[in-house]
Each structure stands twice: as C-alpha cells, then as structure tokens.
Swiss-Prot record:
Its EC number is 5.2.1.8. The gene is surA. One of its GO terms (biological process) is Gram-negative-bacterium-type cell outer membrane assembly. It comes from Burkholderia thailandensis (strain ATCC 700388 / DSM 13276 / CCUG 48851 / CIP 106301 / E264). Residues 230-249 are annotated as: Disordered. One of its GO terms (molecular function) is unfolded protein binding. This is Chaperone SurA.
C-alpha cells in the first residue's frame, strides 16, 4: 500500500469538519428565551428576513456548544447580537451564491454526511439517530450541511480561486526563513495595542472601534507616553497584562502589513498609522531588532510514522462486514492486542508483511481521507474504521517529527502559507464589501 497510497493528494473535499455534532436547544429552552419573539422579524437582509424563531434556535445551539466545551457563555444580549450578525452575513452569502448559480447536489451532501459519520466512528444511520437524539431534526442538520458546502463553493469562486502566488514571493518567503547568509535576517521585538473589530461585526461597531483605536494611537504617539502602561490598561489582546510585549519574532511569523510598517521604524518608535487586521486594529511599537537566532532555518514539514490495517470491500466482503471486522480488531487492540500481529494476519495491503508499517509519511503523500484521519490522531492512538477508495483502514500513529523536506516540498509549503495568508485577508475584505453593498436593517429589540 505504501506505493499505492503515496501519490499526490487531490484537492481535499469541502470542509466537512466545520459541521459538528452539536445539539439544538430544547423547545422549552427556546420558549424561555422569548416565545413572543418567535415570529417577529429581527433583521431584514435585502429581500429576505430573519425571524426571532430562527435566531433563538441558533442562539440555543451555540450556547449549548459553548457549555459542552466548558467555554464562558456571553451575556444573553451580547450573544444574541453576535449570533444575529453571523446569520446576517450567512444570509447575504447564501443570496450571493444563488445569484451566482451555485448549487450543491444531493450526492455531494450525502458524501459529506458520510464523512462526518465516519469521523465520528459510526455508519450514517447511527449518526442520524445520534443527531436526532440530541434534539436536532435531521432535515435541519442536512440543510445546514448544504449551506456550509454552498458557502465553501462561493468562497472558492469569489476569493480563493483568484489568489495567486508568484515564484518571486515564494523565493522571498524561503529567504526570509533561511536568511541569505548567517546573521543577515533580523528578528523583531514588538509591543502592540489591539482593539477588537472583527470584519464581520456591524459597521457601527467597527467605526466605534476605529475611533477608539485612533484615540489610543494619538496617545501612544504623544511625547512622554509609556506605551507599556497604555497597553496594559487599554489593549484588548490576551497579552495586555504583559504590556503588549510580543517578544522577539521572526518576520515570517508576523502579518506582512506589520512587517512592512515596522521596517521603516527605529527602535522605540511607534508606527504612525493604524494597521487593520482581520480581527481589529493594531498599534505597534518597535522595541528592538537583533540578528536572527535561527538564520539557517528552512520551512519545515511534519512527517508522521504510521501503520495501518486495510480490509478491501468486495471479493466476498461487504461494506458492513469489513467495517465490523475492523471494529472488532480495534476493540482487541485497545484491550492490549498487538497491532502488528493483527496487521500481518488480516491486512490486505502490501505492508502487511511489515506489520502494516508505512514508514514516515509527508503531507500530500496519502489520499485525503487517510491523511485527515491520520492527522487527527495522537501518538499511539488507533482510529475508528476509515473509508477510502481502497477499502476500510485502521490507522495508528507511531510518532511525528519535523523534517526539512525537499526543495519542492519547501516551495509547496511556502506557496501554501503565502496563499493562505492572502486568502484570509481577501476573504475579510470581500465579506466587508459584500455587507456594505447589501441592505441590512437590524430590528432586534434592545434588552431581548
């Protein structure tokens, strides 16, 4: 299987992992949140509306999800406003997708649901039963899955497909990682003050945040201002208590806008303009520069040492039989059985004679389903049965290591990192422009 599995992976499927098992609030909980608002319009979005019932359902789901994750649940007013804003952005994008003729067929939705069921270690019928047992109607779950897929296709069409990365940018990125010669690269020590203003926030909130940030910038630029003290009292970043001190950072680890801004500064100077980042506004002060502590570093790849047991479907073995056999084998391994012996006995892959050992695998060398499952495992952990085009697998990760990789792998990593950074910024800009060009009227009553 090593030779069979190790081919360049095709583009991964749409991001099914975004759609997780999360129960909706019960009807009783929804009523408690304000039954009188159930059918009241809380937002007008172009020619569409969002009702109180829809908002309550989404708020209940998110509140339950936060509780499950043991994360703090914001005050009701704040949570409702945040969720409504998310729903407005989602509705605008769905409208745009429909205008663009983007559709998601049933086969694609079913394939996504199948991957979700597999990721949760169960067949689709069991997965459906679990979703419904947790209070989420299956048709609602399927609809949300279809929406996620539609928005992924929209982003691919409107944003991601238009991102280009030149060979010169790749070369520059690699050079910034390695340095043209020892000691040539300089790490930067920065302090910053951050004011939150997510791109998807209401425009009024963004304007207010910008006004606050501009006031803080003027204070930071004023003679005699203690930047560290100002950051401690005003910054909304997690490092505010440290005076916004980021420590020394390699330029490649910082947003390009920040690097460009501080490149013109002398130590001790504050950048004279605000820097817009996806989550808000940054005020940056250059504290110091120093020769890179790792000038020869190259872009690294993470290799995974993995072994597996493969059962092929067909040849007298059905889908359910192959899957059940691997469930039984996994149960025995978890009880202390020897993975290697099971692989030698049952695996139908060429690696069976090596106990299923595939050696060290680099990113992109396996099919996407196998790689996603492998990447989700901790060292020593055994997966649930994983379906690929080859059959069903049990996968065990034996270890991970950083490796420099080939020249081509380094270029691929650089291109991916640059493209990802560009795509996130482009998506934030596009989403802001899309909202600005839409008619949105928020009717959410104050205190509800």
């Amino acid at each position: 299987m090593k030779k069979t599995l190790r081919f360049a992976a095709v583009a991964a499927g749409l991001v099914a992992s975004l759609i997780t098992v999360a129960p909706s609030a019960s009807a009783q909980a929804l009523r408690a949140q304000g039954a009188s608002l159930a059918d009241e319009v809380v937002a007008v979005v172009n020619n569409d509306v969002i009702t109180g019932r829809e908002l309550d359902q989404r708020v209940g789901l998110i509140a339950r999800r936060l509780q499950q994750q043991k994360a703090p649940v914001p005050p009701t007013d704040q949570l409702r406003a945040q969720v409504l804003n998310q729903m407005v952005l989602e509705r605008i994008q769905v409208q745009r997708a429909k205008d663009d003729g983007i559709v998601v067929d049933n086969a694609t939705v079913q394939a996504t649901l199948g991957r979700l069921a597999q990721a949760n270690g169960m067949p689709l019928d069991q997965y459906k039963a679990r979703i419904e047992a947790q209070g989420v109607p299956w048709d609602l779950f399927v609809r949300d899955a279809r929406t996620e897929l539609m928005l992924s296709k929209l982003r691919e069409k409107e944003v991601d497909s238009k991102i280009t990365v030149s060979d010169a940018e790749v070369a520059s990125y690699i050079a910034s990682q390695r340095g043209p010669n020892a000691g040539a690269q300089q790490d930067l020590r920065l302090e910053h003050i951050f004011v939150k203003a997510p791109t998807n926030a209401p425009q009024a909130d963004i304007d207010a945040a910008q006004k606050k940030a501009e006031g803080l910038l003027q204070q930071a630029l004023a003679s005699g201002t203690n930047f560290e003290r100002l950051a401690k009292s005003q910054s909304e970043a997690d490092d505010a208590k440290k005076g916004g001190d980021l420590g020394f950072k390699a330029p490649s680890s910082l947003p390009s806008d920040v690097v460009d801004a501080v490149s013109k500064l002398r130590p001790g100077e504050v950048n004279p303009t605000l820097i817009r980042v996806p989550d808000g506004f940054e005020i940056v002060r250059l504290v110091d520069r120093r020769a890179s502590q790792n000038p020869a570093a190259s872009p690294k790849i993470v290799q995974t040492h993995v072994r597996h047991i493969l059962l092929r479907v067909g040849e007298g073995k059905s889908e359910s039989q192959a899957r059940q056999q691997l469930i039984d084998i996994r149960r025995q391994i978890e009880a202390g059985g020897d993975f290697e012996k099971f692989a030698r006995t049952y695996s139908q892959d060429g690696s069976a004679s090596q106990g299923g050992d595939l050696g060290w695998i680099s990113p992109g060398e396996t099919v996407p389903e196998f790689e996603r499952a492998m990447n989700a495992l901790q060292d020593g952990q055994v997966s649930n049965p994983v379906r690929t085009e080859y059959g069903y697998h049990l996968i065990q990760v034996l270890g991970r290591r950083d490796a420099e990789g080939s020249v081509q792998q380094q270029m691929d990593i650089a291109r991916q990192a640059i493209g990802q950074r560009k795509a996130e910024q482009a998506y934030s800009d596009w989403l802001r422009e899309l909202r600005d060009s839409s008619y949105v009227q928020i009717k959410l009553p104050v205190g509800q």
